[in-house]
Design a protein with these regions (language model features):
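Short glycine/proline-enriched turns and hinge-like loops at secondary-structure junctions
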Residues: 31-35, 82-86, 117
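Short beta-strand segments
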Residues: 18-53
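Short, basic/aromatic recognition patches
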Residues: 1-22
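Flexible glycine-rich active-site/ligand-binding loops centered on an Asp-His dyad
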Residues: 103-117
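Structural motif
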Residues: 45-47, 69, 110
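Short hydrophobic/aromatic-rich beta-strand segments that constitute the beta-sheet cores
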Residues: 48-50, 72, 113
Length: 117
């Protein structure tokens, strides 16, 4: 069974519509670090995979490897008039995967969504 609802999966699986998300990690000193990233839904692991150029050399990758925690929000605007934001936020265990290519895999502990109806 998926950690995501049917509406959340439909939103995440719309290829090419939402390729940018924002990942949040926590630095060694407790400071939050939030940056835009590319992502994809990984159906095999029911997780969000975050990738990027030279990812293993980044602060977000080191933070995720050290703390084992991360969050990501994937969002867009269904309409600007009226204002209708929609999003899926995933908080969970972060796995710093190194092979075959570096990525951060976020396994959901908590999923919150809004505006998907």
């Amino acid at each position: 069974m998926s950690a995501f609802s049917g509406a959340e999966l439909a939103y995440l699986r719309r290829d090419g519509e939402r390729r940018l998300g924002r990942i949040a990690t926590v630095g060694r000193d407790g400071t939050p670090h939030v940056v835009p990233v590319g992502w994809r839904y990984n159906a095999e692991h029911d997780a969000i995979d975050v990738g990027g150029r030279d990812l293993a050399a980044t602060k977000k990758y080191r933070d995720a490897a050290r703390s084992g925690r991360a969050a990501i929000v994937i969002d867009d605007l269904a309409s600007v008039d009226p204002w209708r934001p929609r999003a899926v936020e995933v908080r969970g265990r972060a796995e710093a995967v190194s092979e075959p290519a570096a990525l951060i895999r976020i396994h959901p502990d908590r999923v919150v969504s809004w505006g998907l109806d």
